[in-house]
Amino acid sequence: MLSTTQSVTEPTEVTSKKVEDIEKENDEETPYSIFTSYDRLVLIVILSLIGFWSTISSPIYFPALPTLTSYFHTSSSIMNISVVAYLIFQGIAPTISSNLADTFGRRPVILASIIVFCASCVAISQTNVYWLLAVLRCIQAAGIAAVISISSGVAGDVCTRANRGSMVGAVAGLQLVGNGIGGLVGAALISSFNSWRSIFIFLTIGGGVTFILAIFILPETSRKLVGNGSVVPKNILNKSPYIYLPHFKKRMNNDITTIVPATRFDLLGPLKIFFQKNVFCTLLPVGIHFAAWTMVLTSLSTELESRYHYSVMHVGLIYLPQGIACIAGSLVVGKSLDWYYRYRKTIYDQEVECLPLDERPQFNIVATRLTLSVVPALLMIIGLVIFGWCIQYKRHIISIIISTILVSFSASVFIAICTTMLVDLYPNNGSGSTSCLNLMRCWLAALGAGVLDSMINAMNVGGTYTVVAGFCILFDLALIYVLHNAKKKFSNSGPTTTKSPPKQ
């Protein structure tokens, strides 16, 4: 159950009160954020670009696996260790670095992440031994993985619940484009330059250009440092040239009353959130959906080469529709989250307007968000079954493309929905709470990638993805438990403030 006892990590009554009091839309005197729609668009673009290099770094590696196996004179099973290790570190690192971002600011941690990423890519492009490649891939993952969860923290800083869905959905969806088209980019680079090293040179150049852009246009948004954005940060690392642009500077009135009280750095903070029952039961379905998507991406290249005898470049082109599906998902889920929030909030306001303040239940934000997860959950299951059996019986390629579109679209939408809900529950710890999601999805993806070959050998492709679809159904049932507990918690709780109706 979502506990109502006071805790630094749980969305308590006290925390909820702060959220309700702070998240006021368009208050003329003290707006929740001075970031306009234009400023949020700039943030969406730069955060999506930064996160793109995190998500593309795993699948861009897949087309190079046969080449790397030959180059390092090793087996495919040994080479797959580098894939699994990458996913493990991609899950672990953000629980530390994203927590640093919640404490010391978003901007310096993001910039440091890009530096580590670029340095590791340069080193990988020059390595000649397998063990060093595997180690450097772990460093690469640890460096860049945190930017995904930090992006969600930024959304919590500058958006209220009413418009948060659009930003989280757009950023999460656009970032996951890298996951969808990574195979295409990797195949194109290998075909064009006939070298696996070109992949990491490409990542270095892309990361370097993004770093330069981030220096100039990525502002600090942590409410513990800049409040609603109107306070100039004290540390030079948190200062961005963007805040000195005339259109932004004129809104900076140094309103220190909007600064959220700082909390001490808690290394285990994200893990405390992770092991809360409701959070854990929300993360399980997200993790299995992402793991299923990763397994599809992994199987796609090997199965199309072995069963359909496609070239590396031809296989790469099959990844393109998945990237388009991610973009479509980001657009659909963001607008849907905001629309459904307004719809449910209107109904709630009508239901409680005649009740005394001390009898009004809290608005059920958990149900408002998770209700929309039903459709992508069904699409994921359908896509997995179609993919597995169409591959096994060598059906027309269009059926496989359609199935991968369903899987990619549903995974990106499902992740965005649950990410938004976590930020809603922990608006002042958005990066840390979202790192829990990253931890679960990466660890389950690592497990899925590790057992994929054994599953296919034991039950063929069709049976494998039918079983994976079954796991998705089983894990999705955990959301029923979450919704049941949320209904009890929000219906039994009192108002968030005794002075005015709760604002969402």
Swiss-Prot record:
Q: Where are the transmembrane segments?
A: 42-62, 76-96, 107-129, 133-155, 170-190, 199-219, 279-299, 312-332, 371-391, 397-417, 439-456, 461-483
- Matches recorded under SUPFAM superfamilies: MFS general substrate transporter
- Which keywords label this protein? Cell membrane, Membrane, Transmembrane, Transmembrane helix, Transport, Virulence
Gene Ontology terms: biological process? lipid homeostasis; membrane raft assembly; transmembrane transport
Stretches assigned to the Extracellular side: 63-75, 130-132, 191-198, 300-311, 392-396, 457-460
Pfam annotation, one family: MFS_1
Give a GO cellular-component term.
membrane raft
Its signal peptide is: none
- Compartments in which it is found: Cell membrane
* Residues exposed to the Cytoplasmic side: 1-41, 97-106, 156-169, 220-278, 333-370, 418-438, 484-504
Q: Name one GO molecular function term.
A: transmembrane transporter activity
Q: How does it sit in the membrane?
A: Multi-pass membrane protein
The UniProt entry lists the main location of this chain as membrane
Q: What happens when the gene is disrupted?
A: Leads to defects in biofilm architecture and attenuated virulence.
Segments of skewed composition (Polar residues) = 1-14
Renumbered to this chain, region (Disordered) spans 1-23
Keyword Iron listed? The answer is no
| Listed Gene3D superfamilies | MFS general substrate transporter like domains
InterPro entries (alphabetical): MFS (IPR011701), MFS_dom (IPR020846), MFS_trans_sf (IPR036259)
Question: What family does this chain come from, according to its entry?
Answer: Belongs to the major facilitator superfamily. CAR1 family.
Q: What does this protein do?
A: MFS antiporter that does not display functional linkage as drug transporter and performs functions that significantly affect biofilm development and virulence. No substrate for transport has been identified yet, but plays an important role in the growth in the host.
Q: What is this protein called?
A: MFS antiporter QDR2
- Which species is the source of this protein? Candida albicans (strain SC5314 / ATCC MYA-2876)
